[in-house]
Regions:
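Alpha-helical secondary-structure segments
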Residues: 20, 94-101, 129-135, 175-176, ...
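Ligand-site clamp/hinge motif
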Residues: 194-240, 359-360, 368-370
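Structural transition elements
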Residues: 297-332, 350-353
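Extracytoplasmic/peripheral linker and loop segments enriched in polar/acidic and small residues
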Residues: 319, 368-379, 384, 406-472, ...
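Gly/Pro-rich hinge or "lid" segments in bacterial periplasmic/extracellular proteins
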Residues: 148-202, 206-208, 214-216, 323-324, ...
Length: 494
């Protein structure tokens, strides 16, 4: 049956039991300051606390910080921290720990993907043990939104200093669940942390995340009673799941996007005309209809419907398939008969379907796509090393548009795997971070998207809805549009 918003229950929460969660990808990294994979964040929601969080309405709400003030024209943030909090290793959480976490993310030698998210932090001042003042170089509108995700997740300074870049092997936060084990391609196990500050959190004793790459196999395991919740719904099964009274289908409009990352630094796609030729072969509406049906919509940029800037860009229009344009761009790019490239995809039936549809479209003008299936963690490593031509990936989305764009498009950004650089885009991205009036930010993002749809470091394909499927036993789950599974207050009914 279809459920919008979450799994409310008139019953009181129950303690005990083990929650079994199915993931369609294997989490490659348990360090929030090194992680780049959306699937990592599923476990992070329960292993780490953040300075702030978001609620169902995407409003910023307190977590480790109980309150904050913004002063000095938007350049100074002063956070009051929750008292009597300890990390899972027993060391205290305080203002000194917050300062260490920011310094860790900002350390050039540590090379954190979070660095571009907190780059405007100029000074960290400990006012008292439970108060920290953060001064920015200039106003930064998305700062609180940034701190509601990985940049706001606090790790144990003692363990991080001891393990360095190996922190992922023994991750320690302050969340309601602590790390037990990680077996690659198999499972991640967390268990309740009895010293957590929120005494209403941690109803279930243990959370086991099982990696099951095939979405149909995920659903089959849920139906068989081997899982209590899965992080995706196979698109073709959504209509039937809406009618199925033995399971709960949770649906929200998503915040993210799906596309193709293009390596603009090497052949063939260091040739802009060839990027444009390939893009012109894509019929996004047909792709969505064939693979996703009602569960997705064609995209023209990184901002799905409802996010600031979603109707910006090329007049809000979806790019159309244009084979005459594709052939003209092939001639301009010096490849009138077409060319070949390798599209890397992660395992899974849906990913193969997407690649095959793209392959069948591109060949109409002589563009030949070789499809290579690569394990998720490996493809992230190859992205980081620019060892690819094109990769089919997505971004799970953030509540502020800056989080969907800046790190991927700014020169030298922590997630700029395309090697893209455009001085005008850099200027506009920085300006949009400072602007506080929505219409002004929207105009800046509109120009950025227009440029990106011409330069094509990322080819935006579609925006997907956020689906989760759960057993009838699961209660207390709140479904937020960022797609993250927050289990701190859920419980299992008999």
């Amino acid at each position: 049956m279809l459920v919008i918003g979450g799994l409310a229950s008139a019953q009181s929460p129950r303690r005990g039991g083990s929650l079994r969660v199915g993931l369609s990808e294997d989490p490659p990294n348990m360090d929030p300051h090194q992680s780049v994979a959306a699937v990592d964040r599923q476990g992070f929601q329960n292993l780490y606390d953040k300075l702030v969080d978001i609620n169902q309405d995407l409003e910023i709400v307190p977590m480790l910080a109980t309150s904050w003030t913004i002063s000095n024209g938007g350049r100074t943030y002063t956070f009051k921290l929750r008292p009597n909090i300890v990390f899972h290793d027993g060391t205290p959480f305080n203002a000194e720990a917050v300062r260490y976490n920011f310094e860790r993310m900002l350390d050039r030698t540590f090379a954190s993907p979070r660095r571009s998210e907190v780059l405007l932090v100029e000074r960290l001042t400990i006012v008292d043990p439970l108060t920290i003042q953060i001064d920015l170089e200039k106003p930064f509108s998305p700062f609180l939104a940034v701190l509601s995700d990985r940049a706001g997740m606090m790790v144990s300074p003692a363990v991080a200093r001891r393990l360095g870049r190996d922190f992922s092997r023994e991750p320690v936060g302050t969340g309601p669940y602590k790390f037990v084990e990680k077996r690659p391609q198999e499972r991640v196990v967390l268990e309740r942390f009895d010293r957590h500050w929120d005494r209403t959190a941690g109803n279930v004793d243990r959370i086991t995340y099982r990696t099951i790459i095939d979405e149909q196999a995920l659903l089959a395991n849920l139906k068989a009673g081997e899982l209590d919740m899965i992080n995706v719904a196979p698109p073709t099964d959504v209509p039937a799941l809406k009618r199925d009274t033995s399971l709960k289908l949770l649906e929200r409009e998503g915040l993210g996007y799906q596309g193709i990352w293009i390596n603009t630094t090497g052949p063939p796609f260091n040739n802009k005309a060839l990027r444009q030729a390939f893009n012109a072969t894509i019929d996004r509406r047909t792709l969505v209809r064939v693979v996703f049906g009602e569960t997705a919509s064609p995209a023209n940029g990184p901002f799905p419907t409802g996010l600031l800037g979603s109707d910006a860009g090329p007049n809000g229009r979806i790019p159309e398939r244009n084979l005459d344009l594709a052939r003209a761009k092939l001639r301009e790019g010096g490849q009138p008969s077409g060319f070949a490239f390798t599209l890397k995809i992660t395992p899974g039936r849906v990913q193969q379907q997407i690649a095959q549809v793209l392959q069948s479209m591109a060949v109409d003008v002589g563009i030949r796509i070789n499809i290579e299936i690569v394990e998720f963690g490996t493809v992230l490593s190859q992205l980081n090393q620019a060892r690819y031509e094109a990769v089919r990936l997505g971004w799970s989305g953030r509540p502020d548009p800056d989080g969907n764009l800046y790190a991927m498009a700014v020169t030298g950004g922590g997630l700029n795997y395309s090697g893209y650089s455009n001085a005008r885009v850099d200027t506009l991205l920085d300006a949009a971070r400072i602007l506080t009036i929505s219409d002004h930010r929207k105009r800046a993002y509109g120009e950025i998207i227009t440029i990106l749809n011409d330069d094509l470091p990322i080819i935006y394909l579609y925006w997907g809805k956020e689906y989760k499927v759960a057993s009838l036993k699961l209660a207390g789950f709140v479904h937020i549009a960022d797609g993250m599974m927050r289990f701190r207050h859920v419980w299992l009914n008999p």
